[in-house]
A protein has these predicted regions:
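A short, flexible loop at the N-terminus of ABC-type nucleotide-binding domains that lies
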Residues: 1-30, 34-35, 77
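Q-loop/switch helix immediately C-terminal to the Walker
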Residues: 90, 95-111
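Conserved ABC ATPase "signature" region
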Residues: 115-131
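ABC-family nucleotide-binding domains
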Residues: 162, 168-169
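Conserved ABC transporter NBD signature motif
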Residues: 64-75, 79-80
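Hydrophobic anchor residue at the start of the ABC signature
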Residues: 148
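Helix-to-loop junction immediately C-terminal to a conserved catalytic motif
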Residues: 56
Length: 212
């Protein structure tokens, strides 16, 4: 039986440096992201969202390296990004697509996308009345449900979610918590979520505390 020490990390961040103001937000920042759920916490302005963008490979690093299952962002950027699911919560890039069209786009992007699982996610997140609407017509909470449904169906090696419960109704928050509780104990996927506290009873594989 494998012990936690034997389990290989899914994502390795080595000596990351990022700066857009003085002082640098991240200096020689290294972390091993294991399978399961890792929490990124910290006060406002400490860089939680920025760290997710850096790990996703969409925010350029000043220095350092990122690897997912041995694939280096700097050497193979396209292959690296195909291992990561990240959607900017406030993104308008997909606004002209319906929710179903967005899911189809994600299915083509991620080879392990589980269409059979998607129907249950749509139902559990109360998205059924909205799947044929263009995303620009959806409320902030409903758009976040679309991002969450795609995330849980994607089978991406690394899934990054910024404030997963923001603007969700009570039932959908409970459903998302159940999904994260299951993700924490099953499978080889790594989930990195930015949130101000440990979500519910989700067992954490790691915690990245950026301070107050």
């Amino acid at each position: 039986m494998k012990t936690p020490c034997d389990t290989p990390a899914v994502l390795l961040a080595d000596k990351l440096h990022f700066q857009y103001l003085e002082p640098a937000l991240f200096t020689n920042f290294s972390v091993r992201v294991m399978p399961g759920v890792t929490l990124v916490c910290g006060g406002s302005g400490r860089g939680k969202s920025t760290l997710l963008r850096l790990l996703a490979g969409v925010q350029p690093l000043s220095a350092g390296q990122l690897h997912i299952h041995g694939i280096c962002l700097q050497d193979e950027p396209e292959a690296y990004r195909q291992q990561v699911l990240w959607t900017e919560p406030r993104s308008t890039v997909f606004d002209e697509l319906t929710a179903l069209q967005y899911f189809e786009l994600q299915r083509r992007t991620y080879g392990g996308f589980t269409t059979s699982h998607l129907a249950g996610l749509i139902k559990g997140l109360n998205l059924e009345p909205h799947v044929n609407k263009p995303l620009y017509m959806l409320s902030t909470g409903s758009k976040r449900k679309v991002w969450l449904a795609a995330a849980f169906a994607s089978s991406a090696a690394v899934t990054l979610i910024d404030e997963p419960f923001a603007a969700l109704d009570t039932d959908s928050t409970g459903f998302a918590l159940q999904l994260l509780e299951d993700a924490a104990t099953h499978g080889a996927r790594a989930w990195v979520i930015a949130h101000f506290e440990q979500p519910g009873k989700v067992a954490l594989a790691g915690r990245i505390d950026l301070g107050d």
